[in-house]
Every structure is written in C-alpha cells, then in structure tokens.
Design a protein with these regions (language model features):
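Extracellular interaction modules
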Residues: 111-112, 140-146, 157-159, 193-195, ...
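Conserved oxyanion/phosphate-binding beta-strand-loop segments in alpha/beta enzyme cores
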Residues: 196-256, 396
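Middle-to-C-terminal accessory/interaction subdomains
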Residues: 381-451, 458-459, 464-601, 668, ...
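Secondary-structure capping and domain/repeat boundary segments
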Residues: 89-103, 114, 596-677
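Beta-rich interaction/scaffold domains
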Residues: 7-14, 23-171, 668-671
Length: 677
C-alpha cells in the first residue's frame, strides 16, 4: 500500500525538480569528480616489465586469487531491496555504496516509468527526504538528476546509515539475474576453479521474462582478466537453453570486458568475423548482470566454444570416453608425456576406430600448455592443446600432431610443397578459413593474435582432411587497446601475427605465399573494408547509444580504475580513440594492400627478444633512435647494431626489413651509476 506521506513529499519534490533539472550537469560533474581517483597500475608491472615477463606474467597474475579487491564489491550495508511494478517484478535490486559514501540503486533500463517498491529494509522502513517509506510502499517519478537524502535506522547510531542516494537507470538492455545457493559469491571469487549451483533468470529489454531455471554451476573464467575485481564468469544451466536465438546450449560465458573501457571491442571483432564468413562465430548480447540482487555491471553474454551441433559441428570423440568413465574417474586420470615433453596424452585405453577427427585445438602459451591434459609442440615451437577430445589417447595425439607438423613443414618451403609427402600446403588447410582468421587478427591488430585463444579444428576425414581456422575468441586488447609495448598501440604496421614475443611463424610463412596473399587482399577489399567503413559511418555510434547508460553505471559500480590499458578517464574519449584507431588502421591497410605502398619493419631486439618494431615507409628515414634503458644490470647501453656489427643510422633511408640488436658495455664498480640512498 502506498504511503500518503511519501505522496505529499513527492509533490514537493516535483517543485524542487524544476530548479534541480537546471543543475543536472552539475550533479554529473560531482559524480564524476567523486569517482575519479588514483589509477592502480601495480596490478601488473609496468609495460616494460610486461614485455620482459610476457604473457606468462599474466598467467601468474591470473592464478593469484588473493589479490586485494579494491572495488568495495562486498561492502557491508544495511540490506535495502527494491522491486519493480509490472514486468520484471521478480527482479530485486540491492542498495550499493561507493568508497566516498554515496549510495546508489542501479536500475535496469526497463524500470524507467515504473513504480519502485520497497521490498525489504532493516526494521521495515527507511527515510527518504525525512519521510518514512515502509515495506510495500511505491516510489514514483524518481529523478536521476537528484541526490536524495537517505536514512536507514539501525539498532544504534553506529549501525545507522545516513547518505546521499542516487537512482541510476541503465540502457534498454536485457538483464541476467543470477543467484547462488549460499547467497554469496565468496566461494566462487576465492578461486577460479571454485563453483556453486544456483538460479538464473533472463529478462528482455522490456522486462519480460525470457527464461527462469536452475544453474548447475556458476564459476570464474579467464586468465589475466580473472585478476581484476570485475570478474568474468561462466554459467552452466541444468538444461539446454536458446538465448536470443543463438542456439541451444547449457554453458554460457559472461565477458567482463575488464580491459576495454568502451566495452565494444569483442562485439566489433566478432562482427568482423561474421562479415568475412567465418564458421562458428560465437553469438553474443550485451546485458546488465545482477548476482544475488547486487548489480555487477555491463557484461557480454556469449556462447562458450564447444564441440556439438550448436557449436563447432565436428564429431565429438570425447563421447566414447564419457560412456566408459564417470566424471569422478576422469578427474583422477593423469597425463602422460614423451621424454622431451612435446607430446602428452591420457591413458584411457580408448581411441576408437576412426582417429581422423574431430579435433578442436588451441594454440597456447608454453606456461598454459604445461597445465593441460593433452597436446603437442611442433618443431617450430608452437604449443597446441587439445580442447576436444580433452582426454586424448597417445594414438590420437600422435595423429593430429604429425598432421600439423606436416603442414608447418610445407609452408616453410618456398613452393609450399612438403619435401617428403609431396603435398602442397593447401592440401593441409582450408585456405579461406586461414585467410579469414588472419584478417580478423591483423585488421584489429590483436596483441594476442596467433599467440593464445587461437583455435583450429579438424573434422574426420570423411568430412574433410584439412585443418580449419577458428572459432575466433577473446578480443579485448585489439584496436590499440594494449600498451605493453610500442607495437600494439601503433595503427601502422603489418604484424603477420608475429610481433608478439611468443608469436607464431605460421602466418608469416602464409603471408609470403603469392596465392594466399592475393586471395587475402581480395577478401579484405570485398568484405573487411566495407565493414570498417560502416563502423566509422555510424555503426559505432549506434552501439554506443545502445549501451551508454549501462557503461556509465558500470564505471561507477567499479569506481577505482585498475585497468592497466586505460589511457583516458572519460568514456567518450575512449570511444573517440577506438574510432581514431580503426580509421588510421583502415587507411594504413588500404595504402599497403590496395594502393601498393611499401613499408618495412625495423626490429629492435633486447636480450634475444623483440623489444620494439618500427614500421617505416619505403625510402623514408626513422624519426629517432629508441632507447631501451641507459643502464641495465651494471651495463651501459651503447646503441643498436646488426648481427654484422653495422650501427643503426637514423639518417639513412629504409629500403628493406632490418633487425638491430642492443649492445651493452659492462661498467666497472667505479663507473656504475650510484643509486640514491
């Protein structure tokens, strides 16, 4: 029943709003000023250290569940809950308080124009603008522009809450509401491997319920992103469910986009993959996520990469293993490996009559490969893990490893023909899918391209005897959103997916094959370029308009900036940079691939690893000489030299790719720079 006193105060509030509306921008400035704070970059070391340690450092960070959570994700507050009138009435929204003390109700977009019902509060009531609001009372015509005075009585003064209260409404996005059986996320966020059962309710953008059911498990996911306070999750439902027409599945991922302040890069790159015609591109939808009634932010709900009819539609060789072994028995199986550790498998005693497929492979970092059950390392040093079958037999691993080795040996030959089998490289791979994969990674200048989260699949021979590239996955550090070195954030340059310290030579070799290159250029001009043009001609602006309010709520909810890749504080500037990078990248690729301009890479190597790559137009001179460090380990930097001892010269034009190595001279104790005491 509605409280009459509150109705009177709202009438007075309407008068005040005429004055306050004019001051709306001031309120926004105050909110922004309150949430700005020192950026925490100690989560991972500086960019230079990141280059020295590489992605293995990220792996170590990802496996450190004890990292301090600075986001006030579990701030102890009086439990005050709101529900909505009409559609979405089952959804409950809890009160949240920032580090500065301001309180918020983060409301879904479909709550606009609806009454807000006080569902529960300590003692049965709260005070808003000094007027008592009881459980069951309805709040109407709430303003987003106003800071309300909230008082929640406690048993004593120290337990009482008195603070400013702001109501924020999200964009018109669907809402996913999860609950854990314990009512807490403590167990799940303690360790990525922990999981808990619970419930799941999905609402569309109008508040209509699309699904309600049980979740078999809710758990963490991701690698370096798991180290952030805003964590990515994976849910597994108790039944196959079709979300948004994506196809039926039990397992779904919730990407936090923790490194991407625009929250658009994954969505944009997956769209590029679809335009190129790739198979099995994961579908996704931006949602507002609530867990145990608490707003958790803006997430990208997407399919999990999997082998089945709705995913990667190849034969599932894991089914035989699952019919023989229980899940508990599978957990007890230990991997076995050969002497040099380049091939490993699981002794199940099973292989099946046809071992030609299907296989789902992931090219991975060496550190992550070591923790996987099945996989192999090629002679070229590429580590592949078997994601399906996960419990691969020795016979299966040897078959797929030998086939991949033959392919990589073939592309190293100038004519692309394997010296022993006589097969052309195109007999080992579906060339179009590899071109699509290359374009997705190169156009977006993905720092992780070809390094990790890089999938390939091989159907059984009766379907195809070739490897296919894909599905594509994980694109939060693309389009310049990575400052670990001076390569990824530069829109100029052809990476060939080998600019990373742990990169692969596969696409370097393919890029050098005339038939591959010509088909790649044609696909870029006909499919990739129109998509980039559409992004810049308004598509990005449309995406921003659809999610801006949600992004603003997300930014306030996760108020302390810990994203090591964040360069700008304002959301609009992050979007401007994204559009800037895409435009500059498109223009550069057009010059090289369509207009025939020639560019060359100057590689600068420090301690055996590429430290920096400078891309120079043919015939031009470099701008300056990069300096890695004046002193390193008691040695003085003496300059850059080729393997033959020729020094780097910024006054000489560049006509070809070149590589220079850092030269150091060890200093005596008297010559070493003195450190400050």
């Amino acid at each position: 029943m509605e409280n009459k006193k509150f109705a009177r105060i709202l009438a007075l509030t309407d008068i005040f709003l005429l004055v306050l509306l004019a001051g709306g921008p001031v309120l926004k400035e105050k909110i922004e000023e309150a949430r700005k704070r020192e950026i925490y970059l100690e989560q991972e070391q500086s960019r230079e250290e990141g280059q020295e340690n590489g992605p293995e450092r990220e792996e170590a960070d990802a496996e450190s569940p004890g990292q301090e959570n600075r986001k006030s994700a579990h701030r102890e507050l009086p439990e005050v809950l709101l529900t909505l009138e009409g559609e979405g009435e089952q959804l409950k929204i809890s009160l949240w308080q920032s580090n500065e003390g301001s309180c918020y109700f983060f409301l879904p977009g479909f709550a606009k124009g609806k009454g807000l019902i006080l569902d529960s509060a300590p003692g049965g009531s709260v005070y808003l603008e000094n007027m008592e609001i009881k459980e069951g009372d309805v709040l109407r015509e709430i303003s987003e522009e106003k800071v309300y005075e909230l008082s929640v009585p406690g048993e004593n003064e120290t337990e009482s809450l008195n603070a400013g209260l702001i109501f924020m409404y999200s964009s018109e996005l669907p809402v996913l509401s999860l609950s854990t059986n314990s009512g807490s996320m403590e167990l799940i966020e303690e360790d990525k491997g922990n999981e808990e059962a619970g419930g799941a309710v999905l609402y569309d953008q109008m508040g209509a319920k699309l699904y309600e059911g049980q979740a078999e498990s809710i758990k963490g996911r991701g690698n370096s992103t798991w180290g952030l306070a805003k964590k990515p999750y994976q849910i597994r439902l108790c039944e196959d469910v079709d979300f948004f027409g994506f196809g039926k599945a039990k397992a779904w991922n919730l990407l936090a986009n923790g490194y991407d302040e625009t929250r658009l890069r994954n969505q944009i790159v997956l769209g590029l993959a679809r335009e190129l015609g790739m198979n099995y591109v994961p579908e996704g939808q931006m949602v507002d996520l609530y867990i145990n009634d608490s707003y958790r932010g803006n997430y990208y709900l997407t399919e999990k990469i999997r082998v089945d009819e709705g995913g990667v539609a190849i034969r599932d060789m894991e089914k035989l293993t699952e019919t023989v072994y229980s899940p508990e028995e599978l957990e007890m199986l230990e991997p076995v490996q050969n002497e040099d550790g380049t091939r490993k498998w699981v002794e199940t005693g099973l292989s099946g009559e046809d071992i030609t497929g299907g296989y789902l492979l992931e090219r991975e970092l060496k550190s992550r490969f070591q923790t996987e059950l099945s996989g192999f390392v090629t002679d070229q040093g590429d580590c592949y893990t078997l994601q399906s079958p996960l419990y691969a037999s020795e016979e299966q691993v040897n078959y797929i490893a030998d086939l991949m080795q033959e392919f990589q040996d073939a592309i190293e030959e100038k004519d692309g023909i394997h010296p022993l089998t006589g097969k052309h490289y195109s007999e080992y791979i579906d060339v179009d899918s590899f071109i699509q994969k290359y374009l997705v990674e190169e156009v977006s200048k993905n720092y992780d391209g070809g390094v990790t989260s890089s999938f390939f699949y091989k159907p059984q021979d009766s379907v195809s005897k070739k490897f296919f590239a894909g599905p594509v996955w994980d694109y939060d550090v693309v389009f310049g959103n990575c400052n670990l070195d001076k390569i990824a954030s530069n829109p100029v340059g052809i990476t060939r997916l080998n600019d990373h310290v742990y990169g692969t030579d596969v696409f370097v070799e393919l890029y050098g094959k005339e038939d591959f290159y010509d088909r790649m250029i044609k696909m870029y001009e006909e499919k990739a370029l129109p998509y980039l043009n559409a992004l810049l001609d308004g598509k990005i602006d449309e995406m921003v308009a659809e999610s801006r309010n949600s992004a603003e709520m997300d930014s306030i909810r996760w108020e302390e900036l810990e994203n090591r890749y964040q360069y700008y504080e304002e959301y609009d500037n992050d979007v401007r940079y994204l559009k800037y990078f895409i435009k500059e990248r498109r223009d550069f690729l057009n010059k090289v691939w369509l207009e025939g301009e020639s560019y060359h890479n100057i590689n600068f190597v420090v301690d055996g690893e590429i430290w920096q790559i400078t891309c120079i137009r043919d015939g031009e001179t470099p701008d300056a000489e990069p300096i890695p460090a004046r002193y390193s380990g008691g040695s003085l930097f003496m300059g850059w030299f080729t393997e033959d001892g020729v020094p780097y010269d910024i006054y000489k034009p560049v006509y070809e790719d070149m590589t220079f190595y850092a030269s150091w001279q060890e200093l005596s104790a008297l010559e070493k720079p003195q450190e400050d005491s």
